[in-house]
């Protein structure tokens, strides 16, 4: 416990919360250009080929971003929108690409959770 005199001299320091998505620079999303589109394997108990792209953002950062959903149309110079949100079993992937925005097409034949994958409402 600090004495009154110590508190007068120094005061209490407030803990500064570190951002989990520093590349977004306090914005909800950021635009960027794909520099590399590739697949990678997840951490130990899981097994898959996860689709990931390396993106150079307008904020100057270059980050890895996960491409959710089944199938995608991204290539090297595609312009994509990035949001925060990590992928637990891919180390270093702290961002998601927004499907159905800019050059990233929505998921085809998606009927549930459509808004998360940029899919339009199917015709009856």
Swiss-Prot record:
GO terms for molecular function: rRNA binding; structural constituent of ribosome; tRNA binding. It comes from the Bacteria. CDD domains: Ribosomal_S12. One of its GO terms (cellular component) is small ribosomal subunit. The keyword Lipoprotein does not apply. The modification 3-methylthioaspartic acid is found at residue 89. With S4 and S5 plays an important role in translational accuracy. Part of the 30S ribosomal subunit. Contacts proteins S8 and S17. May interact with IF1 in the 30S initiation complex. HAMAP family: Ribosomal_uS12_B. Belongs to the universal ribosomal protein uS12 family. This is Small ribosomal subunit protein uS12. The lineage of its organism: Bacteria, Pseudomonadati, Pseudomonadota, Gammaproteobacteria, Moraxellales.
